[in-house]
Amino acid sequence: MASTAKILVTNDDGIHSPGLRLLYEAVKELGRVYVLAPETPKSASGLGITLHKPLRIGKVKIWGDTMVYITNGTPSDVIYIAIEEFSPRFDVVVSGVNIGDNTSIQVILSSGTIGAAAQAALLGIPGIAFSADIDEASQLEEDRETWENMKRVIRAITSWVLEHGMPEGVDLISVNFPRKVRKDTKVKIAPAARIKFLQKVSVLYDPRGRKYYWLYGTLVEPEPGSDVYVVHVEKAIAITPLSLNVNVKEGEWAAVVENIKPMIQAAESALRAQTSATVSTA
């Protein structure tokens, strides 16, 4: 499978991110690799797609003589454009390596890196998102041992998915690396924590006295065993299997239906009351 596999490489940090190069180097020998990434950073774009302007792609040579493609769209746009331009079917989409980890449901839902993998998964294509607990791109480039070890892990995980597919019940996989990856770094499966940050808002004023807002967050104490804990406290690699099924858990459905009946009745009563009022007025 590997030699004939079609692999799409993308990210949300933009075409010039060293994380994209690392990802390409890790998977380039596993099949036919296509690189299409946003021309500028699109962090925190989630599953967002572009509907208000034309999307375009272009070619550029980087990393020596490697031809890659750029777009003015989002990471999720990349999936649809790549299917249209390169292949109607990819065997896997790999996204990253993101500068900054994408741990916790709070972050997962806004991540453009995971958004690309999730968009692929929605179309039935295995998606894997890779992220690293670093603050600056230079940290990735300067630590060559971490760089090479991350490549080994990425290649192994991608190769496994190409050979075996996603495990049953799993739509995509999020992989988060600690700041340093050594040969004795542990690899653990970890569920996503609910939140990572306590979200805050700063209220400020520009030189003309107009109010503006700046969003930021402070880290909360991570729950042991969660992806945040594994990466930040244990300094291990966290593998988090994810499902796109956002429905209430099947076993809890009957109880939820029973508990929500009063709300449904209230909604129906509101409709009937409106109808009665309309009839009376007429």
Swiss-Prot record:
Binding site for a divalent metal cation: 12-13, 43, 98
EC number: 3.1.3.5
GO cellular-component term (any): cytoplasm
Localisation: Cytoplasm
Reaction catalysed by this enzyme: a ribonucleoside 5'-phosphate + H2O = a ribonucleoside + phosphate
Superkingdom as given in the UniProt entry: Archaea
This protein's UniProt keywords: Cytoplasm, Hydrolase, Metal-binding, Nucleotide-binding
Cofactor: a divalent metal cation
Broad class of where this protein is predominantly found: cytoplasm
Entry note: cofactor: Binds 1 divalent metal cation per subunit.
Molecular function, one GO term: 5'-nucleotidase activity
Pfam families xref list: SurE
Primary role: Nucleotidase that shows phosphatase activity on nucleoside 5'-monophosphates.
Family statement: Belongs to the SurE nucleotidase family.
Name the record gives this protein: 5'-nucleotidase SurE
Organism of this sequence: Hyperthermus butylicus (strain DSM 5456 / JCM 9403 / PLM1-5)
